[in-house]
């Protein structure tokens, strides 16, 4: 309801989350998820960006997804995240996945770690999805 006031593009937004927040972002990235919650005037996210989540749900109408995790994450196994993205890819959904060597759960922005720069990579993925969405429109 406040997209113009906040200078937000309701057709080009992304959903971001880490750990439990990534579960929420991924679930809300499904095409009709927001409409089911009564937010009918907002289209699907252009991209979902998730960090270290054990969320495994997939559907053919999920949003393009960027994901990253540490190789030593004892809560969100990199293999489980990889399998989820492979299922999304099988639906033709664009994905990008990064495993950062030696990192555990909760590396945040990754400053000073193997994950340094992941935020810029995620933004680039999101921008590519917005560009593709505009091209296809």
Regions found by a protein language model. Name each.
Residues 13, 65, 95:
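Hydrophobic anchor at the start of a short beta-strand
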Residues 31-33, 83-87, 116:
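Glycine-rich, phosphate-binding/catalytic loops in enzymes
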Residues 26, 78-82, 116:
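Short, surface-exposed alpha-helical segments at coil->helix boundaries
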Residues 68, 89-137:
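C-terminal catalytic histidine-bearing segment of alpha/beta-hydrolase fold enzymes
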Residues 67-69, 73:
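Short beta-strand/loop motif that positions the catalytic acidic residue
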Residues 1-62:
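Primarily recognizes the serine-hydrolase "nucleophile elbow" in alpha/beta-hydrolase
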Residues 63, 77-87:
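Short alpha-helix in the alpha/beta-hydrolase fold that links the catalytic acid
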């Amino acid at each position: 309801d406040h997209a113009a006031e906040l200078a937000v593009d309701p057709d080009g937004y992304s959903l971001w989350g880490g750990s439990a927040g990534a579960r929420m972002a991924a679930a809300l990235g499904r095409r009709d998820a927001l409409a089911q919650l009564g937010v009918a005037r907002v289209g699907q996210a252009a991209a979902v960006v998730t960090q270290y989540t054990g969320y495994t749900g997939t559907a053919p109408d999920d949003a393009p997804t960027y994901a990253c995790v540490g190789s030593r994450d004892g809560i969100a196994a990199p293999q489980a995240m990889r399998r989820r993205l492979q299922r999304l890819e099988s639906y033709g959904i664009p994905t990008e996945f990064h495993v950062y060597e030696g990192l555990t759960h909760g590396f945040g922005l990754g400053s000073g770690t193997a994950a340094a720069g992941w935020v810029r990579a995620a933004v680039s993925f999101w921008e590519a999805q917005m560009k593709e969405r505009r091209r296809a429109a």
